Amino acid sequence: MSDSTDALPIETHPFEPFLPAHARLLMLGTFPPAPKRWCMEWYYPNFTNDMWRIIGICFFGDKLHFVDTEHKTYRLDALKAFLREKGIAIFDTCLRIRRTTGTASDKDLEVVEQADLDGMLRALPLCQGVLAAGQLATTLFTEHYGIDARKMKMGEHRDFVFEGREIGLYREPSSSRAYPMKVEEKAKFYDRMFAELGLYDDNDKSL
């Protein structure tokens, strides 16, 4: 840590962990973007990020299912209710950070304090899968649990054991528009993960 970064403000994660007790999937990013980029006060708040469009495609066959196009935001109440019903938990791998350049890019974040990963998994006794979104989130998670994720291809998962439970760590395409893949193609990867974890029911329009 340099003197120049020491002078930068420390940001604490702005959102509470979303941890439905029956969740079978935990989605972990790195840290939210700066508030000026938000279209709502919740996870994946950048309107150009495609995470909630991917969810819409996989479960409803409609990338705009959770999108409020008129107001350029997301239908947050419907989104939270859906994730709670399906058993999808969300938080990030970093609790406190410094932004070295003011962006949300992994390479521009200095980790001050990591999130309590063990505590999250203990709070989710039925969790069978973890999606670490982004390289820094994956690195922090794999280093913490001693997982060898080298040569791990897109769409694959690596199993690890936490307190007697076998859990799969999944690698999926980034939902950021900076990742060069159409949202429909990204959704195909996520679809397989959701199916493997048993998140679909007869009413869902899986791919």
Predicted segments with their positions:
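Short, hydrophobic/glycine-enriched beta-strand segments
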Residues: 20-30
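A general structural motif
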Residues: 22-23, 126-128, 166
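C-terminal capping/extension of enzyme domains
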Residues: 1-17, 33-35, 45-47, 54, ...
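Internal catalytic-core helix/loop-beta-alpha segment
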Residues: 85-144
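Short, surface-exposed acidic-centric catalytic microdomains
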Residues: 40-109
